[in-house]
A protein has these predicted regions:
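Short, polar loop motifs at secondary-structure junctions
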Residues: 35-37, 50-54, 70-74, 162-169
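Phosphate/diphosphate ligand-binding glycine-rich loop within oxidoreductases
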Residues: 44-119
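N-terminal glycine-/charge-rich "phosphate-binding" loop or analogous flexible N-terminal tail
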Residues: 1-44
Length: 182
């Protein structure tokens, strides 16, 4: 029996995902039909990105799960028409990549790197940034990726604060939650 997998990503993301998803599915030995357009009553699974235009899941009566391409699911989790299980993507590569990207940009701003790169006018700028321990960094969102970034920055000596919807306790990070904590 063929498993019907509907891909609903953001604009132009089909070109990026079609081949890798097809290759991964072939390795499973599963008989499948992966496409951007499948009749709702035939869909077994939806591969989904919150940037897609799909926001009504009611017609997908046979759908067993929505497989989110992103770690963040805050834009879909409250959708009343989403009655099937929802998964989110978290893998070590995504986490490591996000940690590197965030750390790089925090250090870029902390050290004032842009002033040195852009200021190629021959004038020496003797600006000395504060030590990391004297700089506060706040992470808004303490999901898997946010916690990984926050703990890395705390490990570099930054004073780190973090906010989440629900209470969390994270070593070396001052945490706040809910509307009152924002």
């Amino acid at each position: 029996m063929t498993t019907h997998i509907l891909f609903k990503g953001g604009p132009n993301s089909w070109e990026e995902y079609e081949i890798p998803l097809s290759n991964a599915l072939k390795k499973t030995g599963l008989e499948y039909h992966l496409a951007e357009d499948i009749s709702p009553e035939q869909v077994d699974y939806i591969v989904y990105a919150p940037s897609s235009r799909l926001n009504d899941f009611k017609p997908y009566t046979r759908c067993k799960a929505v497989l989110c391409l992103w770690a963040g699911v805050e834009t879909i989790i409250g959708n009343k028409s989403l009655t099937m299980p929802l998964t989110r993507m978290v893998d070590s590569g995504m986490t490591q990549g996000m940690v590197e990207w965030v750390t790089g940009h925090v250090l870029r701003h902390h050290l004032g790197t842009d002033a040195h790169v852009i200021g190629q006018d021959g004038v020496w700028r003797n600006a000395i940034p504060p030590l990391a321990k004297d700089r506060t960094v706040t992470v808004l969102g303490l999901g898997a990726l946010g916690v990984a970034c926050a703990t890395t920055l705390a490990g570099l000596g930054f004073s780190v604060r973090g906010w989440s919807r629900r209470p969390k306790t994270i070593e070396n990070i001052a945490t706040f939650h809910g509307e009152d904590g924002f």
